Amino acid sequence: MCPTDQTRPGEHCHARRLNTVESLFGPLALRRNYYTGRDPSGGRAPLDQSLGVVEGCTPGLARLLCRAGALEPFEDASQSLREYGAIDIEGRRIQRLIQKLGPEFGRWNQSQPAPQALPKGTVFYVEADGTGVPVRRQETLGRQGKGEDGQAKTREIKVGVVFTQAPPEEQTPFLQGRLGPAKILPRLRPDQPQPATPPPPPEQEPARPSRVAGSTRYLTSPDPAPEFGHQLRDLARQQGMALAKLVVFLGDGAAWVWELARVCFPFALLILDFFHAAEHVGLLTEILFGKDTPEAKQHREMWVHLLKNQEQGVDQVILLARQAMPQRGKVRRQAQKALAYFENNRDKMRYWEYQARGLFIGSGVVEAGCKSVVGQRLKQSGMFWNLSGAENILNIRCVLENDHFNQFWNKRFPGPEALKAAA
């Protein structure tokens, strides 16, 4: 007996109304009371709500449809379900279900409880980036783009990620052979033969920082950078940012990324992605020494090495580039423009120091999210989205990527495990 299955003031009961509910085992005929008259937007069926029926589907089927529709185009998902499980559901119905539940997934992704504690010495990372998604024409009206007609064809989806790094004692210390304690050799008697001078110990490779398993949380949003920044900050707080020893913000050279960091993470150590910086070194050497020339390649390799491995490497690169500039002309103007990238971001390019502290210097985690969370589903051939539809898909994909999909369904439909897994 459903406790809410009774008439409320102003309602009229249509007793035993028949409803067909789709399940993992096929359609089911469900007779239940249906109440109208109080809500002008529609009636209510308390038994449907009690059983977790959503868009005419049982919880077990709805869970499967959401997962399939988030991973594949809707018609492909429909075909896969038909082939793998003999489940005959149209692609449009999968789309409607995702439109219904997508906002719930989004709220769930931003409301996970913070950990009780973080291990001592934990470093907390925040990364942000953006990627364009093809959208319908009405979504780009009045927006300028990079095409010949000046009309935008895409809308930017902001992608953020937070994660923690394993404590230093769980990682190999950086350059331990050079910076660690000296080894004390035993003293020899005068009558003992003196050993040959041993070769210097091989220089240890820089320690590779590693993420704590299960700590990565993705967030996506079509909102402007200021709103997205507050969403990302809230997610970081929920995941224990305030408990970390150090907060690091990693990003590329986009102006909105650093403005977001300045406003929402003013206490963080800012690091510009090394691989973006290396690309700009390549552009600079092409300007100064010619495209695809041996001299340009040689200088690029040398300057990238300086930038990454030498203390004050960015200052050395700037100095060498200025020495290589001609006194006047077009090449000088282009080189000065390219060099401004390094001068403006000098304080975020102390890569030797970052590596000595065992920190990440690349924003590969968020760039991987741009491809795996957004690109693989929303940027396939022939796709054009409205923003709400894209956002609903991404909400589910973030929950999947964060490994919270089962938790979402357990929270939405609490009850015995056998009942949750039922049709």
Name what the model sees in each region.
Residues 1-56:
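Basic, low-complexity segments
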Residues 32-423:
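Catalytic center-proximal scaffold of phosphoryl-transfer enzymes
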